[in-house]
Amino acid sequence: MMIMRKTHPLAKMINHAFIDLPAPANISGWWNFGSLIGMCLIIQIATGLFLAMHYTADTLTAFSSVTHICRDVNYGWLIRNMHANGASLFFICLYLHIGRGIYYGSYLYKETWNVGILLLFTVMATAFMGYVLPWGQMSFWGATVITNLLSAIPYIGPDLVEWIWGGFSVDKATLTRFFAFHFILPFIVAALAMVHLLFLHETGSNNPLGIPSNCDKIPFHPYYTFKDLLGVMIVLTLYLSIVLFFPDILGDPDNYTPANPLNTPPHIKPEWYFLFAYAILRSIPNKLGGVIALVLSILVLALFPLLHTSNQRSMTFRPISQFLFWVLVSDLFILTWIGGQPVEPPFILIGQVASILYFLIILVLFPIAGLIENKILKW
């Protein structure tokens, strides 16, 4: 008799994706982040669903409904803190996942990579709209500033902004539609994640050496199911430590003040995971130029497969590219720091230099390093 997981139509799909999937024998802990992002998505959808049961998307009651969740709902404080910090965990895992993809040349799986970029944009949109919902000061002013950037688009810009707002300013209509979109987008993210996996399983996983691993494969279960489970337990421990001991460490104190359109906070800034892009936006004095740079800061990822000049896939044996990679990582930390600082000297200049360096490394220095390394190795 055949095993059911190999014959049943539904079980067969799960079997091919998570049980009998042939996986490279040498993939490291850096390959754990895919499953961790999946875990984050499940946590966010589950906690978000329970929050939505008690939240009201109305400008008059949104802030007090969040207060009600934290004070009066059973374990509401826990659900709210898990959801708020779950977003930070989500982006930490996403950025590490992308960094792994760049370091080990995973971007050469073009379809998987491009769906991944689409996923990043969708998750960013979801997180931005979610940040508006508590209707605190930073929620309101963040929504006002970021949506207003669209007015820089020539000809259609001003009309587009009013269309998104549903009026002449960020108000009840904006909050209601942001709640609707924030609720539906995670399910679109889940669907895109399945497409991401579908494309990945067409080619099989990459590995740290960046060479074909067809001659050395092992079944996903039990080896990588338990390896992923270890990663889940470690990350959950760190995550719950933040949630239970330091729930407000990553938030903005201004968001504990109800939204007031008549009072602007001294420093308007997004959540920490958008600060690098915000710094790039602010480093260009022109509004349209800033918006273009903001979009390109993420869209530039799509150019990685086209700019790959090395004859080796991975950076494992490429010291010049490795050096540039870690300079890029350091540069992103500097941009994140600058994004949270006021627009005044010396932060303006540091932000401009870091922004130029960001694009310079990706568009110019990485391809040149690849060619130099080919020459050194006489390939």
From Swiss-Prot:
<feature type="transmembrane region" description="Helical">
    <location>
        <begin position="226"/>
        <end position="246"/>
    </location>
</feature>
<comment type="similarity">
    <text>Belongs to the cytochrome b family.</text>
</comment>
<dbReference type="Pfam" id="PF00032">
    <property type="entry name" value="Cytochrom_B_C"/>
</dbReference>
<feature type="transmembrane region" description="Helical">
    <location>
        <begin position="77"/>
        <end position="98"/>
    </location>
</feature>
<feature type="transmembrane region" description="Helical">
    <location>
        <begin position="320"/>
        <end position="340"/>
    </location>
</feature>
<dbReference type="InterPro" id="IPR048260">
    <property type="entry name" value="Cytochrome_b_C_euk/bac"/>
</dbReference>
<keyword id="KW-0679">Respiratory chain</keyword>
<keyword id="KW-0813">Transport</keyword>
<dbReference type="InterPro" id="IPR036150">
    <property type="entry name" value="Cyt_b/b6_C_sf"/>
</dbReference>
<feature type="transmembrane region" description="Helical">
    <location>
        <begin position="113"/>
        <end position="133"/>
    </location>
</feature>
<feature type="transmembrane region" description="Helical">
    <location>
        <begin position="33"/>
        <end position="53"/>
    </location>
</feature>
<feature type="binding site" description="axial binding residue">
    <location>
        <position position="196"/>
    </location>
    <ligand>
        <name>heme b b566</name>
    </ligand>
</feature>
<comment type="subunit">
    <text>The cytochrome bc1 complex contains 11 subunits: 3 respiratory subunits (MT-CYB, CYC1 and UQCRFS1), 2 core proteins (UQCRC1 and UQCRC2) and 6 low-molecular weight proteins (UQCRH/QCR6, UQCRB/QCR7, UQCRQ/QCR8, UQCR10/QCR9, UQCR11/QCR10 and a cleavage product of UQCRFS1). This cytochrome bc1 complex then forms a dimer.</text>
</comment>
<dbReference type="InterPro" id="IPR048259">
    <property type="entry name" value="Cytochrome_b_N_euk/bac"/>
</dbReference>
<feature type="transmembrane region" description="Helical">
    <location>
        <begin position="288"/>
        <end position="308"/>
    </location>
</feature>
<dbReference type="GO" id="GO:0008121">
    <property type="term" value="F:ubiquinol-cytochrome-c reductase activity"/>
</dbReference>
<feature type="transmembrane region" description="Helical">
    <location>
        <begin position="347"/>
        <end position="367"/>
    </location>
</feature>
<keyword id="KW-0249">Electron transport</keyword>
<dbReference type="GO" id="GO:0046872">
    <property type="term" value="F:metal ion binding"/>
</dbReference>
<dbReference type="InterPro" id="IPR016174">
    <property type="entry name" value="Di-haem_cyt_TM"/>
</dbReference>
<keyword id="KW-0349">Heme</keyword>
<keyword id="KW-0479">Metal-binding</keyword>
<dbReference type="GO" id="GO:0045275">
    <property type="term" value="C:respiratory chain complex III"/>
</dbReference>
<feature type="binding site" description="axial binding residue">
    <location>
        <position position="83"/>
    </location>
    <ligand>
        <name>heme b b562</name>
    </ligand>
</feature>
<dbReference type="GO" id="GO:0005743">
    <property type="term" value="C:mitochondrial inner membrane"/>
</dbReference>
<feature type="binding site" description="axial binding residue">
    <location>
        <position position="97"/>
    </location>
    <ligand>
        <name>heme b b566</name>
    </ligand>
</feature>
<keyword id="KW-0812">Transmembrane</keyword>
<protein>
    <recommendedName>
        <fullName>Cytochrome b</fullName>
    </recommendedName>
</protein>
<keyword id="KW-0830">Ubiquinone</keyword>
<dbReference type="InterPro" id="IPR027387">
    <property type="entry name" value="Cytb/b6-like_sf"/>
</dbReference>
<keyword id="KW-0472">Membrane</keyword>
<dbReference type="GO" id="GO:0006122">
    <property type="term" value="P:mitochondrial electron transport, ubiquinol to cytochrome c"/>
</dbReference>
<feature type="transmembrane region" description="Helical">
    <location>
        <begin position="178"/>
        <end position="198"/>
    </location>
</feature>
<keyword id="KW-0408">Iron</keyword>
<feature type="binding site">
    <location>
        <position position="201"/>
    </location>
    <ligand>
        <name>a ubiquinone</name>
    </ligand>
</feature>
<dbReference type="Pfam" id="PF00033">
    <property type="entry name" value="Cytochrome_B"/>
</dbReference>
<dbReference type="InterPro" id="IPR005797">
    <property type="entry name" value="Cyt_b/b6_N"/>
</dbReference>
<keyword id="KW-1133">Transmembrane helix</keyword>
<feature type="binding site" description="axial binding residue">
    <location>
        <position position="182"/>
    </location>
    <ligand>
        <name>heme b b562</name>
    </ligand>
</feature>
<comment type="function">
    <text>Component of the ubiquinol-cytochrome c reductase complex (complex III or cytochrome b-c1 complex) that is part of the mitochondrial respiratory chain. The b-c1 complex mediates electron transfer from ubiquinol to cytochrome c. Contributes to the generation of a proton gradient across the mitochondrial membrane that is then used for ATP synthesis.</text>
</comment>
<keyword id="KW-0496">Mitochondrion</keyword>
<dbReference type="InterPro" id="IPR005798">
    <property type="entry name" value="Cyt_b/b6_C"/>
</dbReference>
